[in-house]
């Protein structure tokens, strides 16, 4: 299980990859954007102990989606940088990026499996290569990389993930 490591700013803190840092929007902008979507409605009815973790997952998913949909430059390389940051996070590495610091905390507290976060990144990689799915099964396979991991991560936040679900 990852730990937060040293506080940001200490000598042993390693900065995150420059490409991912450029693609990582400020948390305030992500939270502002969330207010214009359906996501925040649930936050008002949920116990406070879940809100921070859900907002963190939203911020990560939103960042990955924004890279896949709108980032300038080589989007696949930017997505590779996100995967590298996940590698660092799960290895117990330290970052100065507030989004990854919050994600490290949520990963540790909620015991989030890396593969679910990576599947979100993989869905956006696929978005760069596939623009139309030929069959319904192909579309379902894509959903297993996008919608499914979000649901699994949310279930983990609530400690409700199980084989039956």
State each model region's role.
Residues 2-165:
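Acidic catalytic motifs of isoprenoid enzymes
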């Amino acid at each position: 299980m990852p730990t937060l490591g040293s506080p940001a700013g200490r000598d042993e803190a390693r900065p995150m990859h420059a490409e991912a840092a450029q693609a990582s929007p400020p948390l305030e902008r992500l939270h502002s954007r969330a207010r214009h979507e359906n996501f925040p409605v649930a936050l008002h009815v949920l116990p406070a102990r879940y809100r921070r973790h859900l907002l963190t997952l939203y911020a990560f998913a939103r960042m990955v989606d924004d890279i896949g949909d709108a980032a300038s430059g080589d989007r696949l390389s930017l997505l590779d940088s996100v995967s590298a940051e996940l590698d660092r996070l799960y290895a117990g590495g330290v970052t100065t990026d507030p989004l990854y610091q919050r994600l490290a905390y949520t990963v540790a507290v909620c015991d989030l499996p890396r593969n679910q976060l990576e599947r979100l990144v993989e869905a956006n990689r696929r978005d760069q290569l596939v623009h139309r799915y030929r069959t319904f099964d192909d579309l379902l396979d894509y959903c297993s990389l996008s919608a499914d991991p979000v649901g699994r991560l949310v279930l983990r936040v609530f400690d409700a993930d199980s084989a039956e679900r």
